[in-house]
Structures are given as C-alpha cells and as structure tokens.
Curated annotation (Swiss-Prot):
Its EC number is 5.3.1.6. Catalyzes the reversible conversion of ribose-5-phosphate to ribulose 5-phosphate. Substrate binds at T26, G27, S28, T29, D82, G83, A84, D85, K95, G96, G97, G98, K122. It comes from Streptococcus sanguinis (strain SK36). This is Ribose-5-phosphate isomerase A. One of its GO terms (biological process) is pentose-phosphate shunt, non-oxidative branch.
Amino acid sequence: MENLKKLAGIKAAEFVQSGMIVGLGTGSTAYYFVEEIGRRIKEEGLQITAVTTSSVTSKQAEGLGIPLKSIDDVDQVDVTVDGADEVDSAFNGIKGGGGALLMEKVVAVPTKHYIWVVDESKMVEKLGAFKLPVEVVQYGAEQLFRRFERAGYKPAFREKDDQRFVTDMQNFIIDLDLGVIENSVEFAQELDHVVGVVEHGLFNQMVDKVIVAGKSGLQVLEANK
C-alpha cells in the first residue's frame, strides 16, 4: 500500500504546472506529493511557489528547495494536494489525524483546485468511524470536554509523548468518537457555533478531485460540487 500511496502522490503532482501557487498538504500520502514536487523543481525546472499546511511540511519543503510563501502573502492558491482520513460517498471528508486541520483548512478555502490523495480504505459510505478532531483553545478546554461528554460524543484529549498534543497554533485537539455522522453538514454547523472551538476536521463539499490508491491501481474521482 505504501508504494500505491507514492504513486498517488506522484499522480497528483501532474496537476501542478509552472507559475502556480501550490498548497502542500500534511500526512503520509501528501509527503510523497511534496517529494515529487521537489524532484520536478530539481530535475525538470518546475517553477512554483508553495504554501504549507504544517511546520512538518514546511521543514520537508525547505529541505527539498521548494520556494515558500506565507498564506498571508497570497490571495489565491491554484492547487492544493492533501490527504484525508475518511471520504464519504458525497465527497465530504474528515481530516486532522495528523493534527494540522486548522492550517489545512486555512489553505484549502482560497484554493481553486483542491485534491485529496487517499488509499481505498479511507473511502466510506458515511463519515464517523474515524474520530473527528476538534481544535479548541486551551482556555476553557476542560469545560468544552465536559460539554462534549454530556452530549454523548465520547471525547478524548489527543496526547503525544504522555502529554496533551499541542497544535502548531498552540491549541489542544479533542477527538470525538461519534461512530456515524448522519449529517456532516449539520454537525459542522453545530460545532461552528461552539465558543472555544477554533476549527473541526469536517471538510464538507470542499474537494474537487480524490485520487484513490487501491489494489487494482489508481482512480481519479471527480466530486460533484
């Protein structure tokens, strides 16, 4: 499967042309896309400017000699390629397994052509088996946790190295174990109105293409937005 992820990342890079501003995603599959962009710059003379979705991706891109800009210095991103943790039949997705959901969404919103690269295990009928990440400010996080608990969302603070995980934006992540999300659009709206929630991992009706790596090869699926 790792080789298929690599092939999917390389396939996604075909949508990148010189002169573009490119969003570089975060995660195991996006990693291969970033590597391929670095190779094309070095070997093919590809000329692009990139914005990144995490400190991890920034470090990778810098090591490959990919020119970077801040998202604040661009008005529009031509194409962004990123991974996803789940994608449903309506092309809504859950992202944030790597903890970069806020920056990923900030880059996705001004993107003209948004592409996800996933393996076939991520394609589901309905979202929710993967825990939904909710990024929250540190102040009042315990109160929010209890609120989610009362609602039956089975919350858990994300941890790393036996401590609470802190995002690049210095926030906590509460993962919600929802089982099935019957209406991801409505649930996203509910979370959008919770004070203290900075962002959540529901990416509804945002993606344009999904490149799926499976045992039989690669599929490029077009979202009907």
